[in-house]
Amino acid sequence: MPVLHASTNCGIGLGFNRMKGEVVFLYAFDVANEIISSRVHEILSAKPFPFEIRMDRTLPKDMPLYKPLAIEPPPLAASLHGAPVQPLIRIYDVGVVTVMMRAAFAAAAPGELMRFHNPQLESGLTLDAVALDFCAKVCDGLKDSLVGRTEFPPPPEAYTVFCLTDLDGAKDANAWLAEQRRDVAGLLTETAAEKLSEPQVNEVLRIQRSFENSDLVVIDWDAALVVDLTGYVDDVLYALELANLQLEEFRMMDQRLDKYLDRAYNDLERRPMPLFGAANKTLQHLRRFRVDVAKLTDEVTHITKFFGDWYLARVYLGARDRFYLDQWRASVEQRLAQLDKLYSVVHAEVNEQRMLWLEIIIVIFFALDLMILLCVKR
């Protein structure tokens, strides 16, 4: 799209010479059913450290914080639009590896940041490929810690966050957004601002969070805008990463359930149902899969209980709303209920057939006893 230039108007949010910040790319990879973090002593030849966020706002006491293991590799050899790219890798017990990559920028208007959508390094590699390579190397080093490793490579759930820490002198982030609302909506949807309808602009900006006048968060489906004039955005990025991680997990569970249910229905359509062997194998698979999915669903939800900071909780709830996480969870639970019914049907059918054959065997033995008795009397 054409570059959008800032207006010469002197109002808040207009006429800025330069906005400063960084663009952050979040990737979530579902690599296993579980990662046993207690066994992880090294990631990419580096000692991992528990990732912690700074809590500056009011929070309840004694609130447990989930701390995934993390490493910070050296910056990439190739730059992104002239800026170095700094990766950060985290591993989560629920079987997810996340790759975060950050690059600084300076721009005169939000529209100039459109170039960061679908990023490609100066070497020609895409960031998607770099993130996938990081994930593959991490998984190779975590072989003994991965439980139920998934087929590789899994498709990543990527999310882009535009972080602004300097609005060229503006101190009120919310007033700035009011002036730049259409350009921000165009940036987050990767669409020319002048093409967007007013209802679409309102929808893109619908989920906003702000604690002070110096900060705000706008969350859309594919990208988000984070403004914090204090310069610290890691806490909000962490909340968005967890929501993105949950979306990846629920999406993968939903796909696996669909495939497994299709196979299970095909097995049920076979007549007659074998009494042993395949029947026992089907029951074992159904039982194991039901337990695995129930456990994963609970653990994926559990990792967000760390939000003792009320503002971060509101940011996370906004992301959960935008990503439709409740609907994804409901879809998984619905398929889990179908799996329970299927398990009951298979179990009941196998038991009925076994009881029928048991009755036939009893009748046969009774007939044999009767024949033997008659032969003896003769």
Regions found by a protein language model. Name each.
Residues L4-D215:
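Short Lys/Arg-enriched alpha/beta "domain-start" segment
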